[in-house]
Structure formats: C-alpha cells, structure tokens
Amino acid sequence: MLYIEKERKLPVNDKYDIIVVGSGPSGMGAALSAGMMGAKVLLIESQGSVGGISTSGLMSHFTGHVRSNLYQEVLRRAALHNTFKRGLKTVTIDPEMLRITYYECLKLANVDLRLYTMVCDTIVENNKVKGVICESKSGREAFFAKVVIDCSGDGDVAYKAGAEYYMGREEDGKMQPATLMFKVGGVDYERAIFPPSFETAVQVPEGEIQALGKENLPFPAGHVLLYGSTLPGIVTVNMTNVIGIDGTNADDLTGYGHCSGVDIIGIEDEVHE
C-alpha cells in the first residue's frame, strides 16, 4: 500500500558555506576545521548530543595515527588521560568531558549547531547536492549550502542524493555484528585483566582467557575485551555482539537494543566470575 504525500512549500531556514551532517568524530573534525577557517558552517545532528560514537557510544579510547593540530587541541581542552599501549599513544576517553569539550570548540569556531534534527532528503540540482531537507520539532525545513559534507556514518546524504552504494560483504551481503559498549563500576584494577585486543591470549588460573570467553559467554559474544577508564574502578566493556542486524532498518535497530541489554547481563556475570 502506498500513500501519496501532499505537495507543500518549505521554509528555507538559512544558507551556509558548508553543512556537515553528523557530529561524530569525522563530523566534528569537518565542522571545526571549516569554522576555524572562517566559513559559515551548520552542523546537523539527529541525536540529542554531539560526539556520536565517541560520546554516546561510550567509546573507551582513540586509536590510530591521527595527530593533527585540531585533534591535539581537542585533547588538550578535554584534559584526557594519556596511556601507552603496544608502542602507540592511546588516548582514553572520558565521554562526558569530551562532550563538553566538543561544545566549547564549536562555540569557539562559530559553528551553528542543530540537534534533534534528521536529514530526510537532499536538494539536488544538476547532479550536485545544494542543500538538505530536515525534520525536527520545528517542523520540516530546508537548508542550502555551497558544500554538504556527509558524516552521517551510514552515507545517508549520499544515498538520498542518489549515489550508488552496496551493503555488507560481497559474497552474501552480511554485515559485522552490532556492538553496544557498556561500563562496569567497582572494579579492582589490581586484580583486573585487560586483554589489549580480540586475539590476545592471556593465561589466567582457569585457562586462556579468550578460550574461556568463547566457551562461557552467550553466543554470539565470545571475545574478552576490557579497557580501563579515566575514572577509578570503572571499566569499559566491548564484548556484545548481535548478528543479523541491518543498521539502516529501524526494526532491526530496535531489536538490537533489547538483545544487547540481555547480553550485557550474561557478560557481566561471566566477567565477574
């Protein structure tokens, strides 16, 4: 069954040099860089806070070799705790402090921010994205820009503009399991074990820790991956796996949240043991 939505005129909220869609680490980098260079920038975020996975996702740390001046400035302002692992400088994340720091940086860069605002369509002229159409509590409205940068995480802007895409691996279209990070309090750091990767074999009195995980954790969880945090006694856990999830399907995402919550209970009990 199809329903034909009636045609209507939309208010044009504003025109910008650059619109960035999505306020995760990539979106923050794009918006802050453009703003600091003097561009008129709008950052659009569908959730109620900036930072994406790095904040709302309760991520444990930044990894890799990114060492830009902007990155270093964000870290300096957040006053994050620095550690060293496997020869690489790894920065532990305090999600709340990072969130506050992002807001401060956006203000300093004169970036306009719209939270709770979802991009539901694109404005395309002559095969070029000229703006976006958004839905929010303010209603449906249009924003125009010279450049639109897609940092949505799922390529939402590119998809809505008609770009070609594929999902999952080539042979069967399956995607990696969905993961929900969580934190556990009251941990004795002197006794806790922190395997640095999924593959790291660590011997404990009961046996090899990854083998124990595969044997005892609720399927499809099976690896043991724990990280220290910036707060005493708090450990970040990266061990939930929910398979068969399409990240572009609202029903799948709804079910994933419930399944991850059930997994967390079993994982916490097993890790405690």
Language-model-detected regions and their locations in the chain:
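Rossmann-like dinucleotide-binding core of oxidoreductases
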Residues: 159-273
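Short hydrophobic core segments
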Residues: 21, 143-157
